[in-house]
Amino acid sequence: MKFSVFFSFLISLYSGLWGDKRPNIIFIFADDWGWGDLGCHGHPYLKTPNIDRLASEGTDFHRFSVASGVCSPSRTAVMTGHFPARYSIDGHFAWVPSNQKRNMPDWLNPQAPLLTRFLQEAGYATAHYGKWHLANDMIPDSPLPTAYGIDEYGAFNCAGPQMFVHDDVKMALPFIERSRELGKPFFINLWMHEPHTPFHVDPKLQAEFSELDEADAIYAATLLHADTRIGELLNGLDEIGITDDTLVIFSSDNGPARGAPNTPLSLTYDTATGLGYGLGAAKGITGGRKEYKGSLMEGGIGVPFIARWPGKIPAGKVDQTNIISAVDLVPTFVNWLKSTFLQTTAQTV
């Protein structure tokens, strides 16, 4: 079966799509966000008005899949355009003994072909805010994100100081302003923590789901918090006046995590993100797709993929035809930018 590069049909529709002006690009990559965990995908009680807004103002691609059912290999694929096995990355980066046991490196090789570096070389200001996990905070000598073609960053699951998980949009908006003042297009990896454990809950948001049991309310509040920050980002683009010049993508690294049946609600601690609720509050759903995080079934790798670019990408469209893989992203962007094209395992059309 032939994989199409996402938006390939749009390129044929819009000759001279970019002209002399390159769009800004924001890639929102959630963590463990299930395909069914969106209002626009029919969830019965989750509130995701801002992601739903992206869907109503853009195209919702239903046949997108990532390259792994877990974090680090999935992120490797979107950054390199290669399947993660090429780099012997088949699980999440952990501490050194664990990586050695699995014959994994301790971090992604910074010399790999990288989306951020291609964009940087094409004149983009590049930034990364949120989860990293192309190394690990338990490996203090691992390369920082700046070694990967990234101009500015705030991150966790990396060496050095750990960014507070809810500061992603707070840090991204000033970067957008600075890039605009410099007259440079920008690319932002906004790799959100939600809804990975630990769940860090705002009590005011949890109170909006008082009709639910505690675990469901915690999960719903966690996703609402992420959606609210996405709304702040979209409103910021509106206020600055660059909405029409900005491609915004929302997706997830893999499907939702689920604990064993009757997993008790309890607190758990993560060295990068701190204290919060554990798998007892993991209530993500896949919209009927089989299996969950960690699986190569559709529930583990079939994730949301919504793209908005006003005037360029059709609004309010649901695409159930185009088959898209995460490894298609790098060659698509590189091809659009007319940079030196790399050899990848993906195909262009």
Q: What name fits each language-model region?
A:
Residues F3-W18:
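Sec-dependent N-terminal signal peptides of Gram-negative exported proteins
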Residues M1-K2, I25:
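N-terminal export leaders
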Residues L17-V349:
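Formylglycine-dependent sulfatase
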